[in-house]
C-alpha cells in the first residue's frame, strides 16, 4: 500500500534523533590551538565576508586634554576641570556665583619676602599681603570673600614646581588643589548655586571630570612634553563653537544618484553594549584542581533610543591572542592548582560585532568610506573564589584593561534563517591598575584581565560612538539591494514552495484514475517514492534524513506520539484494575471525549460535534492497524508520487516541506467507518454521521455510545466510497450485497473494476478526492 511511506517516516524518526546527535557532537568538539595574532588576526567565530577594509581615522570622540585656550571670561560647564598655566605672577583666575562666593587665585613667584601687592579682583583694586619663601616652587593662594563688600581671607595654598593649578565645579562644590607637589591633592569649597562665572587671566586647558586622576598627574608632574614646545599656540575659546559642514550624526544623505542606483551616506550614533563570557572547568579528583578558565564568545541583545527611535541591537564579543597562565601549589592531590587560565594583555585583541535593525544595516552590501569613532572603555575584573573541600578558599581578584578602537571592517554572519550584515570593531588593549592576584598564593602583582570574572558583576559594558559609511542602493526605495532578495534561506524556500504549490494543484487534472489506483496498491518506500526527482540519487541518504527530520514535527507525527502515550496510560490503567473493564479510559486514547460519552444527558456538545472529534482520531487508529482495503493515505501518497514525477520545479531542499504538507493537507474531508456484523457506522471530519444496514443500505439511528465503544475494538476503514455515494450507486445501477460489502471495505479490486467499466458515480467520487489533494 502506498501509505507505507507515511508509516516508514513515523517509525524511522529515530534516525533523525541520531543525525541531530551526531551534528551536536561535531559542533561541540573542540581542539586546543595556539594562536599567533598578526596584524590581521581575526576570530573564527562565524563566517565573514570582508568589505573594503578599515579606514584610518585619528579623531577621538572627546579629547582628554583640550587646549590651550587664550584668557577669557566665560561660564564653563560643570563636570570639567579648568587647568591653568600662568607664565607671570599675578591674578590667575577669578570664580564667583554672584551670591555668596568670590574666589580669586593669585600666583607668587619664588623668593618673595612678606610684602603688600596691589591686585584688581572682580573689577575692584585690592591690597593683599603675600610671601613665598621657597626658592624653586611657585605659590598659588586662594583668597575668598562671602559678600560684595566683604574683605578677602586667605584659604587654600598650593606649592607647585610645575606652575599649574586647576579649578572645577562638581555638584554643589568648587574644587581646587592644595599641599605641595608632587603630593598635591584636592580640596573644595561649598558652591551651592548653579551660576558659575570664571575669568581666566592665563592660558588654560579643559579636562573632563572623568579624567580626575590625569588632572592630578598633570598638577604634580607637569604637562606632556608636546604641550611645552613653541609649535603649540593658544587659540580663542570660540574655536570650540565653529560650525562645520560635516554631516551630523543620524542622517541619510544622497551623495549621488542615477536612474537605477544612488549612493547614500549613513551617519549613525551607536551605543555598544557587550559582555565577556567564560568557561570555568574543574578537574576530577578530590576537588582541589581546576583544568581551565577561558574566555568564550558572548552574544548580547538589547534596545536603546537613538533620536527618539527605539533601536534593537545585537553584539557578539570575542577575544584573540590570549595569554595562558598556570599555577601549581604543590604535587599533592590536596594542593590547589590551575592547569590553564587565560589573561588579556597588551598583545591581545577584542572583537565586537555590532548589528542593529536600522536602515543602514539593511543596505550594508556595497560599501565605501567606512569610518568609526568610539570612546575608550576600561574593563575591570572582579573576584572569583575557588571553593575547596577543606581549608580557606583562594580567590582570583583584580585586573583591568582599557579597550581602544583600532579599526572597523564589514562582516557578514550567516545562519540557517538570516544573514546579518554587521560591523566588526577591533580593539587594542592596554593594561591598567589594579593588577590581579590569587589570594593565599604567591601569585600577585600581575597585570591584565583574567577570565575568572571579567564582567565584575556587571550585566554589560557600554561605550558610545558613531560610524559613517556610503552605501550603493537602488534609486527606488521600494526595491532593495539585490542580495537582500535572498536575505534568508527560509524566504527563498517559501518563494519556491509557493511556485511549487501552484504547479502541484494544476497537475491534479492530469492524473489518470486507473494509474492512481494501481500506484496506490504499490508498497512505496522512501527511495522508490522519490526516485523520479532529479539530483536525489546522489544525496539519497541526506535527502531521506531531511524528509524525516521535517516530517517528525508534522501534525500527523505529533498526533501519533501523543496517541501512543495515551494508549500506554490507558493500558496501565486497565492492568491495574483487573476486575473492572474500563472502556472509557481506553477509548479516551482514541476519542478525547470519554467524559462526554460517559454521560450524554449532561453533554454540552451535539452528537455531530462528538463524532467529528472522534473521526479526527480515526485516521491514527487506521494507520496503526492497517487493513486489506485501500485508505485515504494510499490515495494521497499515490497522488503525491504522480505529482513529484510530473513536477519540473521539485528540488531536494523543497521535498521535506512538500511531503510534510501533503501528509497534513491532502484530502481534508475524510469519512471513516466501522462494521459490526450487519451494521455500519460512518463518521466524517465535517461532522456528518450515518448508521445503516450493510445488506439493504437502510439508514438506522446513530448510537454514539456504541460507536465510541466500537472504536477501541474494531478495525477502522477509510470510507473511500462514502454512504452518500453508495446509496446513489444502488439507486441508479443496483449493486449486489457482495459488491456493497466490498465497497464498504474499500476493496481495491472492486474499485478498479468500476473505474475500468467507466462508472460515472465511482469515477466522480475518486476525482473529488484527487481535487482535495492540494497544497
From Swiss-Prot:
Highest taxon, organism lineage: Viruses
Region of interest (Hydrophobic), residue spans: 388-408
Region of interest: Spike body and stalk (antigen domain): 247-478
Region annotated Spike head, chain positions: 65-223
Sequence motif YGL motif, location on chain: 447-449
Keywords: Capsid protein, Coiled coil, Disulfide bond, Hemagglutinin, Host cell membrane, Host cytoplasm, Host cytoskeleton, Host endoplasmic reticulum, Host membrane, Host-virus interaction, Membrane, Outer capsid protein, Viral attachment to host cell, Viral penetration into host cytoplasm, Viral penetration via permeabilization of host membrane, Virion, Virus entry into host cell
GO biological process, one term: virion attachment to host cell
Region: Spike foot, residue numbers: 509-775
Record keyword Membrane present: yes
UniProt site positions, description: Cleavage: 230-231, 240-241, 246-247
Pfam annotation, one family: VP4_haemagglut
The keyword Ion transport appears for this protein: no
Short motif DGE motif, span: 307-309
Coiled coil (UniProt feature): 483-510
Disulphide bridges, residue numbers: 202-215, 317-379
Entry's Gene Ontology cellular component terms: host cell endoplasmic reticulum-Golgi intermediate compartment; host cell plasma membrane; host cell rough endoplasmic reticulum; host cytoskeleton; membrane; viral outer capsid
Further remarks about this protein from its record: This strain probably does not use sialic acid to attach to the host cell.
Family statement drawn from the similarity comment of this UniProt entry: Belongs to the rotavirus VP4 family.
Official protein name in the record: Outer capsid protein VP4
Amino acid at each position: 500500500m502506498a501509505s507505507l511511506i507515511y508509516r516508514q517516516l513515523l517509525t524511522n524518526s529515530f534516525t533523525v534523533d541520531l543525525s541531530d546527535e551526531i551534528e551536536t557532537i561535531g559542533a561541540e568538539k573542540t581542539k586546543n590551538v595556539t594562536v599567533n595574532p598578526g596584524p590581521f588576526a581575526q576570530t573564527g567565530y562565524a563566517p565573514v565576508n570582508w568589505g573594503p577594509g578599515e579606514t584610518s581615522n585619528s579623531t577621538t570622540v572627546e579629547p582628554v586634554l583640550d587646549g590651550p585656550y587664550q584668557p577669557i571670561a566665560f561660564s564653563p560647564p560643570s563636570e570639567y576641570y579648568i587647568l591653568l598655566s600662568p607664565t607671570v605672577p599675578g591674578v590667575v583666575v577669578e570664580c564667583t556665583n554672584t551670591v555668596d562666593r568670590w574666589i580669586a587665585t593669585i600666583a607668587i613667584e619664588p623668593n618673595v619676602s612678606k610684602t603688600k601687592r596691589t591686585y584688581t579682583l572682580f573689577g575692584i583694586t585690592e591690597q593683599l599681603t603675600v610671601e613665598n619663601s621657597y626658592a624653586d616652587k611657585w605659590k598659588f593662594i586662594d583668597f575668598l570673600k562671602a559678600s560684595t563688600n566683604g574683605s578677602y581671607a586667605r584659604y587654600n595654598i598650593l606649592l607647585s614646581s610645575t606652575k599649574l593649578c586647576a579649578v572645577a565645579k562638581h555638584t554643589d562644590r568648587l574644587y581646587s588643589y592644595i599641599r605641595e607637589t608632587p603630593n598635591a591633592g584636592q580640596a573644595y569649597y561649598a558652591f551651592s548655586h548653579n551660576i558659575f562665572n570664571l575669568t581666566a587671566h592665563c592660558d588654560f586647558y579643559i579636562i573632563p571630570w572623568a579624567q580626575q586622576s590625569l588632572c592630578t598627574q598633570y598638577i604634580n608632574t607637569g604637562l606632556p612634553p608636546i604641550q611645552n614646545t613653541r609649535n603649540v599656540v593658544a587659540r580663542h575659546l570660540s574655536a570650540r563653537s565653529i560650525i562645520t559642514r560635516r554631516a551630523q550624526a543620524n542622517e541619510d544623505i544622497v551623495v549621488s544618484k542615477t536612474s537605477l542606483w544612488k549612493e547614500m551616506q549613513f551617519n549613525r550614533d551607536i551605543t555598544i553594549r557587550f559582555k565577556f563570557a567564560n568557561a570555568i572547568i574543574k578537574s576530577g579528583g578530590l576537588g582541589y584542581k581546576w583544568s581551565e578558565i577561558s574566555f568564550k564568545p558572548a552574544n548580547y541583545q538589547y534596545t536603546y533610543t537613538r533620536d527618539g527611535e527605539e533601536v534593537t541591537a545585537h553584539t557578539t564579543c570575542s577575544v584573540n591572542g590570549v595569554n595562558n597562565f598556570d599555577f601549581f601549589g604543590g604535587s599533592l592531590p590536596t594542593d590547589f592548582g590551575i592547569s590553564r587560565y587565560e589573561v588579556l594583555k597588551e598583545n591581545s585583541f577584542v572583537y565586537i560585532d555590532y548589528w542593529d535593525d536600522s536602515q543602514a544595516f539593511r543596505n550594508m552590501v556595497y560599501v565605501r568610506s567606512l569610518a568609526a569613532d568610539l570612546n575608550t572603555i576600561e574593563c575591570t575584573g572582579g573576584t572569583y573564589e575557588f571553593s575547596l573541600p577543606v581549608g580557606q578558599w583562594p580567590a582570583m581578584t583584580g585586573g583591568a584593561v582599557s579597550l581602544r578602537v583600532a579599526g572597523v571592517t564589514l562582516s557578514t554572519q550567516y545562519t540557517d534563517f538570516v544573514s546579518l550584515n554587521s560591523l566588526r570593531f577591533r580593539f587594542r588593549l592596554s593594561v591598567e591598575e589594579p593588577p590581579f592576584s590569587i589570594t593565599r598564593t604567591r601569585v600577585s602583582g600581575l597585570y591584565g584581565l583574567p577570565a575568572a570574572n571579567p564582567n565584575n558583576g556587571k550585566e554589560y559594558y557600554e561605550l558610545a560612538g558613531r560610524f559613517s559609511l556610503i552605501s550603493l542602493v537602488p534609486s527606488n526605495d521600494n526595491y532593495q539591494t539585490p542580495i537582500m532578495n535572498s536575505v534568508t534561506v527560509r524566504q527563498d524556500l517559501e518563494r519556491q514552495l509557493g511556485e511549487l504549490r501552484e504547479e502541484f494543484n494544476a497537475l491534479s487534472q492530469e492524473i489518470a484514475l486507473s494509474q492512481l489506483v494501481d500506484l496506490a496498491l504499490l508498497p512505496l518506500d522512501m527511495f522508490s517514492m522519490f526516485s523520479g526527482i532529479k539530483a536525489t540519487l546522489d544525496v539519497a541518504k541526506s535527502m531521506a534524513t531531511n524528509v524525516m527530520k521535517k516530517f517528525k514535527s508534522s501534525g500527523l507525527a505529533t498526533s501519533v506520539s501523543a496517541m501512543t502515550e495515551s494508549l500506554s496510560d490507558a493500558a496501565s490503567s486497565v492492568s491495574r484494575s483487573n476486575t473492572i473493564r474500563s472502556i472509557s479510559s481506553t477509548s479516551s486514547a482514541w476519542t478525547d471525549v470519554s467524559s462526554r460519552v460517559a454521560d450524554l444527558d449532561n453533554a454540552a456538545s451535539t452528537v455531530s460535534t462528538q463524532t467529528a472529534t472522534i473521526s479526527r482520531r480515526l485516521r491514527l487508529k487506521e494507520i496503526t492497524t492497517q487493513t486489506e482495503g485501500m485508505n485515504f493515505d494510499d490515495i494521497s501518497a499515490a497522488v503525491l508520487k504522480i505529482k513529484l514525477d510530473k513536477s519540473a520545479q521539485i528540488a531536494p531542499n523543497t521535498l521535506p516541506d512538500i511531503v510534510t504538507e501533503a501528509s497534513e493537507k491532502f484530502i481534508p474531508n475524510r469519512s471513516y467507518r466501522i462494521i459490526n456484523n450487519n451494521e455500519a457506522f460512518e463518521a466524517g471530519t465535517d461532522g456528518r454521521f450515518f448508521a445503516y444496514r450493510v445488506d439493504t443500505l437502510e439508514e438506522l439511528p446513530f448510537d454514539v455510545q456504541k460507536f465510541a465503544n466500537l472504536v477501541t475494538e474494531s478495525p477502522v476503514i477509510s470510507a473511500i466510497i462514502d454512504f452518500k455515494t453508495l446509496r446513489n450507486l444502488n439507486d441508479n445501477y443496483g449493486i449486489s450485497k457482495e459488491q456493497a460489502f466490498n465497497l464498504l471495505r474499500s476493496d481495491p479490486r472492486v474499485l478498479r473494476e468500476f473505474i475500468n467499466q467507466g462508472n460515472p458515480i465511482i469515477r466522480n467520487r475518486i476525482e473529488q478526492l484527487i481535487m482535495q489533494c492540494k497544497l
